[in-house]
Swiss-Prot record:
Disordered, as annotated region: 191-211
Name recorded for this polypeptide: Protein IMPACT homolog
A GO biological-process term: GCN2-mediated signaling
Subcellular location: Cytoplasm
GO molecular function, one term: protein sequestering activity
Binding partners and assembly: Interacts with GCN1; prevents the interaction of GCN1 with EIF2AK4/GCN2 and inhibits EIF2AK4/GCN2 kinase activity. Interaction with RPL39; this interaction occurs in a GCN1-independent manner. Associates with ribosomes; this interaction occurs in a GCN1-independent manner. Associates with actin; this interaction occurs in a GCN1-independent manner.
Organism annotation: Dictyostelium discoideum (Social amoeba)
């Protein structure tokens, strides 16, 4: 441990005397926390127990034992669009960190977040924001603890609100499309003089939707974090959803830390329909969509999958996200998609 690290530990232990602790573990026993150390038999891990600020949540977002099982609470949950926390149970955040040899000069610390109420996707969102806090040659542990204490709940709350709004929008679009298809089928059936078996066969063919071909590019790995881009040629939001569903049907993709995506396609009236989703990797989707727009893509969906390796990359992760997006888009532009893998079709 270098002098800067020692001074930071002294400061953290002084600021948080009741919640700071030092844990000495045998190498191999801490793998579930994402920590590894091949240089010594024992590894020092530090933990700070954080009570997050939940003042940003409204009454419908807070549960307790008195109302968690009644019908009124169920109605409140249905009307709530954000994060829900049961305050009658432990909602603490257990923040663990460990120093790398070159922290803070060239490397960030290794960190992990655990809480009984946090889902895996929640952890990914928080870790993504913590990555943004680290700057070369700057101590960052106190800043990370403060951010988790003051900002983490609000970030998750806003994330859940945006996800539910997006899901409602696509559900509404899907229902409208289904209704139009049903009306069209009824009209066609009334005007067709074919027999019943022919009509049934035609309806089955219409119900059978073909998923656009998914092309997967080469993966890039840095400090155990892996990035891989997937491309599909799409012409509608329905095709976008079919591709996303297909990718997420694979366990490998479903269990990834992030699956951010962006798409652009041209409508019949000539307008461009475009959208992006960060999937917890704040700012990633916007950069992907900018890349599509800059290349004037008009029928493209790109999904970038990231498997977090346990070591913060800071801004480097955006370099890999953008580069994998550019690489697979370049294969499309040069008619070289045959070089891609088709493993997720």
């Amino acid at each position: 441990m270098n002098e800067e690290q020692e001074n930071e530990i002294l400061a953290i232990s002084s600021i948080y005397p009741d919640s700071f602790s030092e844990i000495e573990t045998i190498v191999g026993e801490e793998e579930n926390d994402g920590f590894e150390d091949n240089d010594s038999q024992y590894s020092k891990i530090y933990q700070v127990i954080i009570t997050p600020n939940i003042s940003c949540l409204d009454e419908n977002s807070l549960e307790d034992n008195n109302n968690s099982n009644n019908n009124n609470n169920n109605n409140n949950n249905n009307n709530n669009n954000g994060l829900i926390i049961d305050t009658s149970y432990d909602y603490l955040i257990y923040f663990k960190f460990k120093y790398t040899k070159e922290y803070p000069s060239n490397e960030p610390p290794i960190i992990s977040i655990k809480a009984t109420w946090l889902q895996k996707s929640d952890q990914s969102i928080l870790l993504s924001h913590l990555e943004d806090l680290w700057n070369q040659n700057e101590l960052v542990i106190f800043q990370m603890i403060s951010w988790l204490q003051e900002e983490s709940i609000e970030i998750l709350n806003n994330h859940y609100k945006s996800i539910k709004k997006f899901s409602h929008y696509h559900l509404k679009k899907s229902l409208n499309t289904q209704q139009l298809n049903q009306n069209q089928n009824q009209f066609e059936n009334q005007n067709q003089n074919q027999n019943q078996n022919q009509n049934q066969n035609q309806n089955k063919e219409k119900e059978k939707e073909k998923v656009p071909t998914i092309y997967t590019g080469q993966s890039v790995t840095e400090k155990k974090s892996k990035f891989q881009a997937h491309l599909a040629i799409v012409h509608s939001e329905r095709e976008v959803q079919l591709v996303l569903n297909q990718l997420l049907s694979f366990k490998k993709i479903y269990e990834a830390t992030h699956n951010m995506y962006a798409y652009r396609f041209q409508l019949e009236n000539g307008e461009i329909n475009e959208y992006y989703n960060d999937d917890g990797e704040d700012g990633a989707g916007d950069k992907m969509l900018f890349t599509l727009s800059k290349n004037q893509a008009k029928e493209i969906l790109i999904v970038c999958t990231r498997w977090f390796g346990g070591i913060l990359l800071g801004g480097r992760r955006y370099v890999h996200i953008v580069n994998t997006t550019k690489d697979i888009l370049n294969l499309y532009n040069t008619n070289s998609l045959s070089q891609c893998s088709l493993e997720f079709n």
